[in-house]
Amino acid sequence: MDKFVKLTGVAAPLPVVNIDTDMIIPKDYLKTIKRTGLGKGLFAEARYNEDGSENPDFVLNKPAYRDAKILVAGDNFGCGSSREHAPWALLDFGIRCVISTSFADIFYNNCFKNGILPIKVSQEDLDKLMDDASRGSNAILTVDLENLEITGPDGGSIKFDLDAFKRHCLLNGLDDIGLTMEKGKAIDEFEKKNAASHPWAA
């Protein structure tokens, strides 16, 4: 998993509340267990018309936001089913940070396991960031995980809180497998001691 230390990029505004995982990645895209290729299905029902053509009114289809790395969204983002394809689709599109006032718990935790930083802010701060994100090609935000700070295009900054363990994992690019590998030496030592003290169990 790629480390997340500091991210600077275009932030796309999506001022919609209760965006569920079915909206993020419709069920038609859930047949695969691969993490790649799902970006094309991200927000598919909103991004595409019935004939498959792009909906020019959807934010991620607008030229200024096609390469967005940050999403500023309404309250209760990621509610609905627990499909891990939702963060996979965001990541495959190129989005590594989602900012909202609240997230569904399962989606929130799945983000950290996939290298995405979900940030919770107050409604006042979200309104400011949503305004920043509405500046089109000038909607550049910098998310500094080391200092727990978001800097807007005008130079103003917003602080955010994050669990220390989750922060450690993102800064070091550690998913569940990475965390286990990090303890590899201790696991090997335990197995040697356990085999010596319980030879009948070997």
Swiss-Prot record:
Gene3D superfamilies: Aconitase, domain 4. It catalyses: (2R,3S)-3-isopropylmalate = (2S)-2-isopropylmalate. Signal peptide: none annotated. It comes from the Bacteria. Keywords: Amino-acid biosynthesis, Branched-chain amino acid biosynthesis, Leucine biosynthesis, Lyase. Pathway: Amino-acid biosynthesis; L-leucine biosynthesis; L-leucine from 3-methyl-2-oxobutanoate: step 2/4. It holds the Pfam family Aconitase_C. GO terms for cellular component: 3-isopropylmalate dehydratase complex. One of its GO terms (molecular function) is 3-isopropylmalate dehydratase activity. InterPro entries: 3-IsopropMal_deHydase_ssu, Aconitase/3IPM_dehydase_swvl, AconitaseA/IPMdHydase_ssu_swvl, IPMI_Swivel, LeuD. The keyword Amino-acid biosynthesis applies. One of its GO terms (biological process) is L-leucine biosynthetic process. Its EC number is 4.2.1.33. Belongs to the LeuD family. LeuD type 1 subfamily. Heterodimer of LeuC and LeuD. Catalyzes the isomerization between 2-isopropylmalate and 3-isopropylmalate, via the formation of 2-isopropylmaleate. This is 3-isopropylmalate dehydratase small subunit. It comes from Rhizobium etli (strain CIAT 652). The gene is leuD.
